[in-house]
């Protein structure tokens, strides 16, 4: 018995419905997979961007903290420098006052001859030369002439040799000098300053650390003195 057109049409419709259903299922499967991949990629991108944002803000926080530390360090250093400057200014004022009082020493007729003798002796003992040129203030010339024989005797006892001292009467020390002498030997190649000013500077360099301690107390960060 042959198949009627009606049956053929039914079979065709059935086959078409099956194909359409299968196609729809396949399309849904593709859509689902595509959506899943999209969500995975979206999640990855979101996480990546979140990580970048976190790293950005962490970097900014570190920069801000570093800047804060730098500013704090600068402020601390500036404070220390101001404190050190104030201390140095105070020490300088103490030494300036001592310098201004030097002129009073040479004006003390009772004390100055012994001091001047000591300065001459110190200079001669530093040089230990056979021939020495001595400069002094013009106002001290007569006193130096009086003291020199005794100084040379003392030098000979200490050194065991004699020294010829020539007084330079053409080039006196400045009148504003506080006092003392300058000595030279070997045509001026060797010079020794034995003035009150030079002795004060020498003493100042030696006692500045002690002056700092006396004025401001010991420095906990300092383990030695100059």
From Swiss-Prot:
Question: Which InterPro entries does the record match to this protein?
Answer: ATPase_E_C, ATPase_V1_Esu
According to its UniProt record, where is this protein mainly located?
Answer: cytoplasm
Q: What is this protein's tissue specificity according to the annotation? A: Expressed in the excretory cell and syncytial hypodermal cells (at protein level). Expressed in the intestine (at protein level).
What is seen without this gene? Larvae are arrested at the L1 stage. Larvae exhibit swollen vacuoles in the hypodermis of the head region, gradually spreading throughout the whole body. Pharyngeal pumping ceases at L2 larval stage with many vacuoles covering the entire body. Causes necrotic cell death in intestine and hypodermis. RNAi-mediated knockdown causes sterility, formation of endomitotic oocytes in the proximal gonads, and impaired ovulation. Diakinesis stage oocytes are displaced toward distal gonads. Impaired yolk uptake by the oocytes from the pseudoceolomic cavities.
Q: Does the keyword Membrane apply?
A: yes
Which Gene3D superfamilies does the UniProt record give? 6.10.250.1620, ATP synthase, E subunit, C-terminal (3.30.2320.30)
Give the location in the cell.
Cytoplasm; Apical cell membrane
Topologically, how does it sit relative to the membrane?
Answer: Peripheral membrane protein
Give the source's domain of life in one word.
Answer: Eukaryota
Q: What does this protein do?
A: Subunit of the V1 complex of vacuolar(H+)-ATPase (V-ATPase), a multisubunit enzyme composed of a peripheral complex (V1) that hydrolyzes ATP and a membrane integral complex (V0) that translocates protons. V-ATPase is responsible for acidifying and maintaining the pH of intracellular compartments and in some cell types, is targeted to the plasma membrane, where it is responsible for acidifying the extracellular environment. Regulates pH homeostasis in the intestine. Probably by regulating cytoplasmic pH, required for cell survival in the intestine and hypodermis.
Record note on quaternary structure: V-ATPase is a heteromultimeric enzyme made up of two complexes: the ATP-hydrolytic V1 complex and the proton translocation V0 complex. The V1 complex consists of three catalytic AB heterodimers that form a heterohexamer, three peripheral stalks each consisting of EG heterodimers, one central rotor including subunits D and F, and the regulatory subunits C and H. The proton translocation complex V0 consists of the proton transport subunit a, a ring of proteolipid subunits c9c'', rotary subunit d, subunits e and f, and the accessory subunits vah-19/Ac45 and vah-20/PRR.
The UniProt family comment states: Belongs to the V-ATPase E subunit family.
The name under which this protein is listed is V-type proton ATPase subunit E
> What is the name of the gene encoding this protein?
vha-8
């Amino acid at each position: 018995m042959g198949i009627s057109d009606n049956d053929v049409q039914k079979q065709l419709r059935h086959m078409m419905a099956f194909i359409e259903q299968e196609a729809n299922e396949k399309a849904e499967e593709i859509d689902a997979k595509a959506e899943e991949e999209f969500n995975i990629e979206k999640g990855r991108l979101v996480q990546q961007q979140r990580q970048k944002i976190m790293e950005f803000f962490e970097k900014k926080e570190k920069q801000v903290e570093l800047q804060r530390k730098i500013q704090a360090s600068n402020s601390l250093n500036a404070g220390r420098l101001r404190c050190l400057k104030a201390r140095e200014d105070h020490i300088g004022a103490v030494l300036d006052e001592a310098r201004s009082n030097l002129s009073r020493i040479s004006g003390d007729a009772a004390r100055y001859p012994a001091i001047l003798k000591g300065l001459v002796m110190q200079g001669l003992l530093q040089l230990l030369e056979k021939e020495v040129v001595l400069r002094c203030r013009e106002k001290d010339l007569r006193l130096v002439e009086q003291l020199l024989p005794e100084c040379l005797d003392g030098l000979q006892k200490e050194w065991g040799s004699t020294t010829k001292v020539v007084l330079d009467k053409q080039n006196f020390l400045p009148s504003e000098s506080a006092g003392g002498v300058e000595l030279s030997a070997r045509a001026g190649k060797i010079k020794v300053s034995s003035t009150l000013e030079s002795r004060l500077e020498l003493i100042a360099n030696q006692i500045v650390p002690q002056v700092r301690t006396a004025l401001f107390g010991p420095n906990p960060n300092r383990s030695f003195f100059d």
